[in-house]
Amino acid sequence: MNKMNYGCEGLCVVISGGTSGIGLAAAQRFLADGARVYILGRSEERGAQALCYLDEQTGKQAVYISCDVTKQAECKAAVAKIAEQEGRPDWQLDILVNSAGFYREQRLEQLTEADFDAMMNVNVKGMMFLTQAALPYLRSKSNVVNIASDAAVSGNYGCALYCATKGAVVAFTRALALDLAPSVRVNCVCPADVDTPLLAQQLADANGGYTLADVAAAYPLQRIAAAEEIAHVICSLAAPANSFMTGSIVTVDGGLTAG
C-alpha cells in the first residue's frame, strides 16, 4: 500500500463491514493516516483476524466491535460502546463508512420473500440503522461515506434485487446529504468488481467456470480493482481537503460504464 496523507490524523472512524474486503482496506488506509479506527462485524473470529492483519500492516491498533447492522438495537449498542470507549461527553464521530453489504445473483423469477428481506436488510436497512444510531455524534465537519455499486447506475444481468438495493443506497445518500447539510457531508462510492473474498465466492457459486481473468476482460483497463484502490477513494472523499463535496456519487469502475 502506498503511503498517502489524507489529513485524517486524530479523527475517529467507524467502518461497518470492516473485517474484510473494501471495509478492511479502508481501515488500513485510515489507520496508516493516523486515525482512530473502529471496525464493525458479525464474526468475532474474523474480527480478531482483521485486527491482527491491521497491526501487521500498519503497526497500529484498531478496535473491533461486534454488530449485526440489520438489527437496530445492535447498531445503537455498538455506537454507545464506541462513545464509552472514547470517554468524552463531546465525542464526535468524524467519519462513518457504511461498507457492510450482501450479494447473491438471483433472477427475479427465483426470488422469495426471504431472499428479498435478506438483501434489503443488509444493503439498505443496515445502512440506515447504523447511520441513525450515529446521528447524535455526527457533528460539524463529520462525514458519511456509503458504499453502493456500479449496479446502482448500470443494470446487471441476473441480479435485479441487488441492483435495486444499491440504487436505494444512491438515493439515500443524496437525500441524507440534504438532510444533514451544512454540518455533515454525505457521499457515495460505486465500485464495480473488486478483488475480494466476496468476488471469489461469487465466481465459485456461479458454476460457470468463470475466472478473475474472464471478469477483467470486460473492462477497458483489462483488470478489476484492488480493494486498496476503492479504499483510497473512500479516504479521499472523507478527507478535510474535499470539504465542498457532498451528495456526490463517485463511480470507480475502470471505465466499465463509460460506453
Per-region residue spans from a language model:
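Substrate-binding pocket helix/loop in short-chain dehydrogenase/reductase
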Residues: R107-L108, T112-D117, V215
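Active-site loop immediately N-terminal to the catalytic Tyr-X3-Lys motif
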Residues: E109, S154-A160, Q222, P240
